[in-house]
Amino acid sequence: MVVNLILLLGLLGGYLLVMPAITYFYLQKRWYVASSLERGFMYFLVFFFFPSLLLLSPFLNFRPQPRKI
């Protein structure tokens, strides 16, 4: 019973906090330079982790980077 509870809490923590944070940093680094296949993978990640990305949504920032002249 205790092992199941620990496993469930670990999976829940991974789904709600760890993987969305990794997804967020990946999207932030690759959003403007991704190929079409990579962009499809990004959309899949956002779809798959959508409920947990809502927890991180106040911190998401996808504003365009300033241009370098």
Curated annotation (Swiss-Prot):
The chain crosses the membrane at residues 5-25, 40-60. Pfam families: NdhL (PF10716). It is found in: Cellular thylakoid membrane. The keyword Ligase does not apply. Disulfide bonds: none annotated. It is an enzyme of class 7 (translocase). It comes from the Bacteria. It catalyses: a plastoquinone + NADH + (n+1) H(+)(in) = a plastoquinol + NAD(+) + n H(+)(out); a plastoquinone + NADPH + (n+1) H(+)(in) = a plastoquinol + NADP(+) + n H(+)(out). Its EC number is 7.1.1.-. It is a multi-pass membrane protein. GO terms for molecular function: oxidoreductase activity, acting on NAD(P)H, quinone or similar compound as acceptor; quinone binding. GO terms for cellular component: plasma membrane-derived thylakoid membrane. The keyword Metal-binding does not apply. InterPro entries: NADH-quinone_OxRdatse_su_L. Keywords: Membrane, NAD, NADP, Plastoquinone, Quinone, Thylakoid, Translocase, Transmembrane, Transmembrane helix, Transport. Its main location: membrane. Belongs to the complex I NdhL subunit family. NDH-1 shuttles electrons from an unknown electron donor, via FMN and iron-sulfur (Fe-S) centers, to quinones in the respiratory and/or the photosynthetic chain. The immediate electron acceptor for the enzyme in this species is believed to be plastoquinone. Couples the redox reaction to proton translocation, and thus conserves the redox energy in a proton gradient. Cyanobacterial NDH-1 also plays a role in inorganic carbon-concentration. NDH-1 can be composed of about 15 different subunits; different subcomplexes with different compositions have been identified which probably have different functions. PANTHER family: NAD(P)H-QUINONE OXIDOREDUCTASE SUBUNIT L, CHLOROPLASTIC (PTHR36727:SF2). This is NAD(P)H-quinone oxidoreductase subunit L. It comes from Acaryochloris marina (strain MBIC 11017). The lineage of its organism: Bacteria, Bacillati, Cyanobacteriota, Cyanophyceae, Acaryochloridales.
